[in-house]
């Protein structure tokens, strides 16, 4: 199995590391990776056999980068949109104290009722999942039309060979439904600092559950912003003016977190150095 990864590095020393988790059917185009069956990674396009395995792939890749010598002292942030938001929450659940903060854009804490089939259909399709898991027969509206507000962006997504546009495969839909139900039941376990953004007119993931996440999470540092009139894809599918608002809020939040986080790190390093003393021979000794 080959998984496509990419990174963007600034010319100057970065304040911290940001890891991006893309949404269902999308690709990575900072540090990022395409999930199995997505973008430029290998595997059946649009097929998620095991969501836990997908999260483990991300965890191992991101953790490996964080633990490199040149990155070991840098702040670590994860950012995810839609299904990527669910990946972010599960990465946090895997290692609750590892990440310094998260940015969640319309996270998949619950699939909106407008997209989800009725319970009778779900029960029937769940049984079929064991027999024909890769079949594309889930009766859902066109997600591209629901997610992206701008017609030009919809065309761009439809024209990309790396973005999956077909109906959800049975096993994929089952995995997404199962994971979203699990996350919805365990919102109170979220403990890291986070910025949570959601469009008020989102028809793909439920804005009311994002509000519930903000209320239930035990995080002492949490911010929720609901953008009236905006759709599901906040990072790519909105008007230029709306996209500017969203990324301005993200940049402001990151600047605040890196400023306080790096100041704390400097104090810790200074405290450690204060305990060291150089003797007459030039050797550094620890002062008890």
Regions inferred by a protein language model and the residue ranges of each:
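Short, surface-exposed "cap/lid" segments of acyl-processing enzymes
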Residues: 9-38, 42
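Short beta-strand/loop motif that positions the catalytic acidic residue
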Residues: 190, 196-198, 202
């Amino acid at each position: 199995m080959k998984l496509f990864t990419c990174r963007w590095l600034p010319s100057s020393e970065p304040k911290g590391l940001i890891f991006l988790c893309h949404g269902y059917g999308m690709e990575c185009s900072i540090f990022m990776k395409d999930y199995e069956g997505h973008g430029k990674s290998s595997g059946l396009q649009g097929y998620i056999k095991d969501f836990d395995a997908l999260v483990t792939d991300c965890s191992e890749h991101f953790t490996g980068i964080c633990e490199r010598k040149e990155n070991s002292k840098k702040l670590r942030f994860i950012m995810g949109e839609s299904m990527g938001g669910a990946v972010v929450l599960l990465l946090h659940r895997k290692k609750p104290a590892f990440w310094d903060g998260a940015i969640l854009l319309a996270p998949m804490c619950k699939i909106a009722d407008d997209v989800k089939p009725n319970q009778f259909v779900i029960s029937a399709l769940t049984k079929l999942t064991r027999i024909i898991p890769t079949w594309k027969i889930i009766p859902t509206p066109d997600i591209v039309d629901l997610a992206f507000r701008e017609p030009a962006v919809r065309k761009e997504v439809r024209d990309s060979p790396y973005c999956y546009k077909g109906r959800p495969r049975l096993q994929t839909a089952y995995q997404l439904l199962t994971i979203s139900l699990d996350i919805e039941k365990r919102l109170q376990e979220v403990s890291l600092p986070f910025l949570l953004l959601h469009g008020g007119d989102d028809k793909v993931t439920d804005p009311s559950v994002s509000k519930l996440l903000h209320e239930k999470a035990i995080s002492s540092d949490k911010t929720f912003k609901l953008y009236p009139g905006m759709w599901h894809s906040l990072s790519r599918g909105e008007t230029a003016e709306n996209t500017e608002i969203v990324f301005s809020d993200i940049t402001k939040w990151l600047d605040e977190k890196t400023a306080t986080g790096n100041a704390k790190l400097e104090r810790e390093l200074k405290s450690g150095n204060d305990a060291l003393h150089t003797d007459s021979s030039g050797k550094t000794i620890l002062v008890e």
